[in-house]
């Protein structure tokens, strides 16, 4: 029976007799004495086999190879001073083996050496195909442990401190195609009918509030059949929460406590509270994006009023067409950002055009506030306009002003992208800094130009602000997103809980009453039986852990992730199925493989 885990042994365990199990991480024969690093999920410890002490264990050790599964019995000893290893927690001790039992060997050549630093250079496709080997690596093991710790911290806070109840909601439910495409599951017992895998437990958690559960949470599995997008998974995990009888501010305060508790428990970091708040309008005005990275400045400045009557048609024409002109003021940019980077073919030009802009206009502020720019701008701005630009942007000698002109969405999108690129170039982003904030007061709806209708910006169950309820198309929502260093960590809202308001929202997004009853009749009926005021939030667990682990991809914090093409290289899912299975489900495939 195991007495200890490998990574738990310390100097306080010296002279204890222990039984360990694990994998051979490294193996070395030093002139008759064999050393092996034994690894389990907690870490590594050095095993020593000396033929002068235990000939039997030495004979077994001589047959060891990397990744053999073994059992070791022995005594914990203090390492000699010259072999202390401060790089690992067990570096003060080693185990003198009394016996070594090989439980299993390795019968094929390893696709990569797990204990080698070169394993980091292995192609991701190989790592995913042999994921069970990849997960043996220290980095991946630590990521899974971190994920476990985050979930445990969430549970302890919600259950022990806030009286939440964990409730499971169905995985097989009905399709309500309002967001991404559903994953559909045919029903064998109800021919011609289909289940959908949930994109979120949204409706069920609201029904739990109608049921009187009061405070609900779930570590929920969710599914979205989205087009191929970098770093998205077709199945993902979220912390899902809903609570009754709580105000907007009370919900935000409770969630700040949750996130602060996770940081303190998992990283021993104290997060200051309350979190700053920005309205959606403020975020778009200052940063051009509704999830701003506030670890650095470089705020955008709207100069539409200054240039609306200028002779430079790019500026004046944009304003007259209902668009805007904004500036990204960049201090001390002279020796870092060249004109070549701004002009066609340059790095910043490419970033702006990829975001939809046609190009970038610029002005450099030289000594005595002289402007260095193209003649078309310099000759078509009055002295008064030039002075107003300098004053409004706070520009000083050495500043570079990057202009975006056009429709509001494109200008904001392109300048927001440039802001991040420039922030990195100037070294303004502190990777160790943690900035958490709320963005609130989102629009209820956005215009879908393709379908020529309004659609819910978040989802159609979000409550409008009371003062906007009589003008729903232009209403602001009682919604809130938590932003972590420019990435959305979670989002939620107060919910609609009156049937008449819910019906008005459905009507606003173009759902007829018949369609609304067909898709959401069970919810509308529930609202007739005493529904409490309620609200909730959901956090993307995969992304949260990725940020805490400082990983670049969420695939590195998920045990068995899918590729960008939504396939599993380990199991080769999705796969074809037997014709008999399709026949039982009354399904005929129309897909014709390419010959």
Swiss-Prot record:
Keywords: Aminoacyl-tRNA synthetase, ATP-binding, Cytoplasm, Ligase, Nucleotide-binding, Protein biosynthesis. Signal peptide: none annotated. InterPro entries: Aa-tRNA-synt_II (IPR004364), aa-tRNA-synth_II (IPR006195), aa-tRNA-synth_II/BPL/LPL (IPR045864), Asp-tRNA-ligase_1 (IPR004524), Asp-tRNA-ligase_1_N (IPR047089), Asp/Asn-tRNA-synth_IIb (IPR002312), AspRS_core (IPR047090), GAD-like_sf (IPR004115). GO terms for molecular function: aspartate-tRNA ligase activity; aspartate-tRNA(Asn) ligase activity; ATP binding; nucleic acid binding. Its EC number is 6.1.1.23. The record marks 30 as: Important for tRNA non-discrimination. It catalyses: tRNA(Asx) + L-aspartate + ATP = L-aspartyl-tRNA(Asx) + AMP + diphosphate. Residues 202-205 are annotated as: Aspartate. One of its GO terms (biological process) is aspartyl-tRNA aminoacylation. ATP binds at residues 224-226, 233, 488, 540-543. It is found in: Cytoplasm. Disulfide bonds: none annotated. L-aspartate binds at residues 178, 224, 458, 495. One of its GO terms (cellular component) is cytoplasm. Its main location: cytoplasm. Pfam families: GAD, tRNA-synt_2, tRNA_anti-codon. Homodimer. PANTHER family: ASPARTATE--TRNA LIGASE, MITOCHONDRIAL, ASPARTYL/LYSYL-TRNA SYNTHETASE. Belongs to the class-II aminoacyl-tRNA synthetase family. Type 1 subfamily. Aspartyl-tRNA synthetase with relaxed tRNA specificity since it is able to aspartylate not only its cognate tRNA(Asp) but also tRNA(Asn). Reaction proceeds in two steps: L-aspartate is first activated by ATP to form Asp-AMP and then transferred to the acceptor end of tRNA(Asp/Asn). This is Aspartate--tRNA(Asp/Asn) ligase. It comes from Gloeothece citriformis (strain PCC 7424).
